[in-house]
């Protein structure tokens, strides 16, 4: 029986449309703010507001899924995101957009938690890696296509908002034709996120999501700046970023399959080692194409493998709470990593980007090389 059941396929179709909308807005909102002559710090504050919304949305979604189930939680999350999009056209200004991007951030995080939790609850330990790999492939393909759309369509605010809002609402439609069951038993109370963060046997998975956030946040946010400082043109920067993201897309399926077959711990060790090798290759200014490719293939696949590993360590009724904890960890890493790395790059050298990535990866590799321990097979494995 295929792991890609009808509910899974429809869920991923809806996610693709929503990811397109997310990618378009995340690219254009800073440009729209700049056109309104807002100061750089104000543009940064609006971006931070969106990520703050991500944190809040992550914390809220477990309760919503427990009370309403996956389908209705998905509808509500999509409508919140749509409201955050429509609000941008109601009033253009710093404080207004600060609020509406916060709302959009809440909606986006809720969508991610619902989709990831639904996929994990739909799978088993034998196929969860492939399900999450498919999720990440859809996410990165949607991001790539969103960037492509920005380069092909008019980018004026009132030209973009109608069709982006329509795309968000269209993302609801696939789930109207199926029902995703929440297999979390009613007799279990809602599991606190803090207990998942403290769970000793899942700590390597949680730490892996933090490291993944640091690595991906730094690559996404600071790689274009690094390339620019190397004298590379904007067009060429776009090409090299495409190489990086494409490697991440191509790596999802084989690495997910290898993780299901040989175990997540072994695959995580190899991935982190390859990230270190890719960082060293960039520092030595060796052939950039293969260096970026292996960095993207290993770095962009850390999150789903770490997530699947952590989810092996909990019972089925704890999967939603664990997913919240992992997404929260990733978000914290993606906020702190680029901020700290950017300060180091500004004060010392651009090479600190890869030194930082290699350093945090090395620390995580040491954790992975220690005895991970053996725990009884939990219900989530079945």
Curated annotation (Swiss-Prot):
Keywords: Cell inner membrane, Cell membrane, Membrane, Transmembrane, Transmembrane helix, Transport. The chain crosses the membrane at residues 8-28, 45-65, 79-99, 102-122, 131-151, 157-177, 204-224, 235-255, 270-290, 291-311, 325-345, 349-369. It is a multi-pass membrane protein. InterPro entries: MFS, MFS_dom, MFS_trans_sf, MFS_YcaD, MFS_YcaD-like. PROSITE patterns: MFS (PS50850). The keyword Membrane applies. It is found in: Cell inner membrane. This is Uncharacterized MFS-type transporter CKO_02171.
